[in-house]
Amino acid sequence: MILSFYQMVKGDVSFRLPQGMFSPEQISLMKQAKCIILPPICRSVHYWFCKKFAPVFPCMDTRFHFPGKVGHIFLFELAGIPYPPTKVYHGLEEFKKRQAEGEKLFEYPFVVKWSKGGGGVFVHLVKNEKELFYILEQFRGYEKKGPSFIIQPYIEHDHCDLRVVVIGNRFLTYWRCQQTPGEFRSNVSRGAKIFYNLNPKLEQKAISLTKKLCQKTGINLAAMDIMFSKDKKPFFLEINYGFGVHGLGGFQRYKEILNEEVKTWINSVLKNNDKKSVI
């Protein structure tokens, strides 16, 4: 029996994911389930609870073990995935302490990113010390939600980044190119345009690195943002577990691909279970 809490994927039995605790009926069904499907953005307690009963799609282990942009940096390092030189700070007081001890920053301009937030929110290009301290003071109001932030050098590139979307065993790519004067972020929500097949060689390089990351982590539903420097070196920027679907052909196309890949994943799980039962 396949149990789904994700409206986009129909199971043998389907529910909306509850806000609080699962009902006795739902828990009883979990105990019978061969597989459980969850929405890609859910609470950690729901995810870990479901995993106690059956294999879960999507795999969100890394999302909860390595949260936010800070967590992504640690994950990239462990997996041997290239990323920009990065300084990690766990709050403004730590930043001030390390500066007082003589730690040097990158040369201006550099990029400051609060660990949380998506769509380019809380990502700033800093051109001088005055701008830096103005931005850090803005972060102060968000410290209760998580104080960590990172600083990375600004890498010269062609104002485009590549998004590699992982859906099960499928790896789909598209470029986001920023053509708005004065805007350095390549988010579609900030005016970037979507293009396809701009550089197949770089796209294949990015897919190979993404496959390596997925093999090491189990990630099977996420979008990777990757930048290429002027000399074509790849740098992974972040992992998006919730992502827009416009570049994939829209909602309906995404739903079709998702259901195809979930079906493949379920068949793989059931096949492995059959092998174990024979052994």
Language model features with spans:
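Short strand-connecting beta-turns/loops that link adjacent beta-strands
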Residues: 117, 169, 229-232
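A short glycine-rich, hydrophobically flanked beta-strand micro-motif that places a catalytic Asp/Glu
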Residues: 152-153, 219-231
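C-terminal active-site "lid" helix and adjoining low-complexity regulatory extension at the edge
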Residues: 228-279
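Short glycine-enriched loops at secondary-structure junctions
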Residues: 39-43, 62-63, 177-180, 227-231
